Amino acid sequence: MTTALALEYIPRRMEELGYGKNYYIRFRHLTLQAGELLELEAYNQFYILVEDPPASISVISDFGMYDLSFGKTNEQSYEHQGLIYINNYDSIPNHLRFIQVIPKHLKTEEKK
């Protein structure tokens, strides 16, 4: 998914989930060392994968999987939430980019 498409998708998705414009976005550029496994806790937020990563990187979360090296999946997920595992299977460092979407936690009165 391109960054432009993600930035177009995010407002619609957040509206769909009932947050309207009550969220923050953060651009995240992760560098994974050779063989590194990174674990992210994203239970109350979303990570939108942008700029397709190398085939040697896999992203597995409660929402789905993005892993071009795994031939048995018929769908690659770009939206991730919950516990996210990011694995660099390569023998060299690799880069991965996400847009992190963090809903604002507002009082009930403020949501109206």
Tell what function each PLM region has:
Residues 2-27, 90-112:
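C-terminal interaction-tip segments
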Residues 20, 71, 86-87:
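Generic cytosolic/nucleocytoplasmic N-terminal low-complexity/intrinsically disordered segments
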Residues 21-58:
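Beta-rich globular "head" domains
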Residues 26, 30-38, 62-78:
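Short, solvent-exposed S/T- and G/P-enriched segments that are highly enriched in secreted/extracellular
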Residues 43-48, 78-99:
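Noncatalytic modules at the cell exterior or secretory-pathway interfaces
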Residues 50-67, 96-101:
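Short, surface-exposed beta-strand/strand-loop-strand elements in extracellular ectodomains
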Residues 75-80, 106-108:
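Short, surface-exposed linear segments at secondary-structure transitions and domain or protein termini
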